[in-house]
Amino acid sequence: MATLLLIIIYFAFIGLGLPDSLFGTAWPAIYTEMGLPFSLGSAVTIIMTCGTITSSLFSSRVIAKYGTGKVTAVSTAMTALALLGFSLSGSFLPLCFLAIPLGLGAGDIDTGLNNYVALLYTSSQMSLLHCFYGIGITISPYLMSRLLATHTGWRGGYRVAFFIQLGIALLLFVTLPLWNKVAGKEAEEETPAKVLSLKELAKIPGVKNMWLLFLCSCGIESVTNNWGSTFLVEFKSMTADQAAKIMIFYFVGFTLGRLLSGILATRLSCWKIIRMGIAVMGIAMVLLLLPLPGATVAIALFLIGMGNSPLFPNFTYLTPRNFGADISQSVIGSQMAASNTGFLVAPLLCGLLGQFFGMGVLPIYLAALFVCLILGVANIQKTMKGAGKDIR
């Protein structure tokens, strides 16, 4: 029964990934059609991410009241309706309003399912969970790139994503009795959760450092996701559909990285996988910084996705091991808020810099985030080693 539930959770994470890569891929076509400056894309991203941060911080209370299954099903349905609304939007303002339910839904799904899997499943299953998120963010730009070249355009891409998301939401509602059965069985084995405030969490050694790691890793992810296509169009002189096709390399690399992390987790520790991911990203940053042709940019984007994607699930899985199962829900909620702060702040600043200095700043910006990530990993390993934790 727990295995069947895990499969359903995997489908829920496909639904979590679907909206995340759509907007960045579609934005060049949207701002061209609506006659908008490309930096306005940050406004939609900000609203969406503020919703996600808010729901992440309050998710432990919501989930405690209604249960992970119900919250996940309702949140997925909410994001499906928002995707339909995007496809019907004729101006910029509706996109901003529709970004609110997209963000709120994503925060509850992300926090609830991450803590659930971190407590009850293996590190391999955690990485595979995020691999399915990778499938979601790979499917949507692929579909969008195909539909951008047709008469349906970006609206058609959002409609297709809506139907996929709606199907996942219906699956979650139909299988709610299964969630209730498994929840009743696991409740006897779970450690009673403590709800801690941000102030209390900040006093725990290592928690603030983990916030930095999530902020930097997710900053790299969101900047590449949201501005990768614009970088290719504005700086590499590609068309919108060409850029969308190149961005598929990033999302394929992202998904492959999560898959390989799940396979390697049966033999290697989380920390070893994290160090391998950072090494792969280092190669990607060098390639991206060099003035090389478009084919090399595709390779660099692929390696950024493959190297960065294992970090989030492994950082998350380590949470109850580093800080204790009793406070893991609160810590993970704060980490999801930190990650979404990265999703919010990093692309916003990149968009503003790109508007003033050109999108050629993107490789330098990503490299700066990468350096902060390396320093953060070194520091948290030192803290955990001092606390007697195994960092091998």
Protein language model features and the residues they cover:
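Conserved MFS/SLC helix-loop-helix module at the cytosolic interface between two early adjacent transmembrane helices
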Residues: T54-L93
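Helix-to-loop junctions at the C-terminal end of transmembrane segments
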Residues: S55-G67, G257-S269, G354-Q355
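A late C-terminal transmembrane helix in Major Facilitator Superfamily
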Residues: F323-M359
